Amino acid sequence: QNYPKNQLPNFYKLMDNKVLKSLADEFSNIHLKSFSQQNLRFSSRFIFSLLINPQISYIYKKNKGFCIFSINKEDAEIITMAVVPKYQNHGIGFLILNELDEVLLKSNCKKVFLEVASNNLIALHLYKKVGFQNFGIRKNYYKILKDKKVDAILMKKVVNLQK
């Protein structure tokens, strides 16, 4: 079936809650593995609340990584993205972001935004590689240990498939 470009179907919205809860558990586990060093984790309950929101979509590479994002007219935001450490630097994140570009183009989205911890060098490298640029900093935004905070780097990118 063909859909208007700005009304792509959210097939997972048709899933029942049991399936979505299972998916939320999977995403939460991947998130924990990816961010264990930073002591950051999105709970399964929080991820489930995202997945049932009609404004939220995701891209999933089974057992390897995912990206949860929102689209609001011509702008999109990556809410979180995680790749299992053993698959980092193996192209999974690159594939996810390329697929995200395709989805955003079909949705007539012009820009995508994200924030990333300043000490997450692997993610910073990946985002810059696919065309994201820094446009600001949130000082001491992420609390990674009991008494340690790191800045959030704000990044944006013009959506296109040309790298």
Model-predicted segments: where are they?
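Acetyl-CoA-dependent GNAT
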Residues: 1-4, 8-14, 22-88, 94-99, ...
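Short hydrophobic/aromatic beta-strand or adjacent loop that forms the aromatic wall/cage
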Residues: 55-57, 149-154
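Residue-level recognition of the GNAT/N-acetyltransferase active site
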Residues: 84, 115-119
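Short glycine/proline-centered loop/turn elements that form peptide/ligand docking sites
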Residues: 93, 97, 120-123, 140-146
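Conserved GNAT acetyl-CoA-binding A-motif
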Residues: 104-115
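Conserved catalytic-core motifs of GNAT/GCN5-like acyltransferases
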Residues: 113-115, 128, 133-150
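Acyl-donor (CoA/ACP) binding surface of acyl/acetyltransferases
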Residues: 139, 150-152, 158-162
